[in-house]
């Protein structure tokens, strides 16, 4: 059963669609798992006043997952503007955003399945640790999918895609 897909499009045609469950990703790519920390402004924290949120997420670099696929060109082609991508969510949020593949490495896009979440102004819904806590307390991602995609765009949205369901990669040549 697919919980996250990567669809590859070339010259307007789908040339491949790779479907993954969380179990498959853990089994097949567990050795490629990484941990990233992201800090970003969230307008919902601090009783709607806004504030800083820090997330340390476990998962897989989207760039690394792409580089494993036979349809994906070499990294230099990924980074020269010849490839674009979109991240899709189950709630259709942010789907119109099309990015260039070089942003995958520049902003550390991570397909996360567990996270330690904390808010600077006190515990908020979903937080697993206090801001000052030295230890990380990971919890599974909860939502309509077991994934979120985080990226290191601290000063520009989006920093997080909730309920991540898949991505479409378009090869322009």
Placement of each model-derived feature along the sequence:
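N-terminal intrinsically disordered, low-complexity segments enriched in P/E/S/T
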Residues: 1-173
């Amino acid at each position: 059963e697919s919980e996250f897909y990567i669809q590859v499009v070339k010259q307007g045609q789908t040339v491949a669609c790779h479907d993954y469950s969380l179990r498959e990703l853990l089994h097949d790519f567990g050795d490629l798992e990484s941990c990233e920390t992201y800090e970003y402004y969230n307008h919902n924290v601090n009783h709607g006043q806004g504030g800083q949120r820090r997330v340390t997420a476990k998962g897989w670099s989207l760039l690394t997952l792409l580089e494993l696929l036979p349809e994906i060109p070499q990294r230099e082609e990924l980074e020269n503007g010849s490839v674009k991508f979109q991240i899709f969510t189950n709630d259709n949020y942010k789907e119109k955003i099309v990015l260039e593949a070089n942003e995958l490495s520049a902003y550390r896009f991570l397909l996360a399945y567990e996270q330690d979440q904390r808010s600077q102004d006190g515990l908020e819904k979903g937080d697993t640790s206090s801001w000052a806590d030295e230890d990380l307390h990971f919890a599974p991602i909860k939502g309509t999918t077991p994934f979120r995609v985080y990226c290191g765009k601290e000063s520009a949205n989006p920093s997080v895609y909730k309920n991540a369901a898949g991505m479409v990669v378009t090869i322009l040549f």
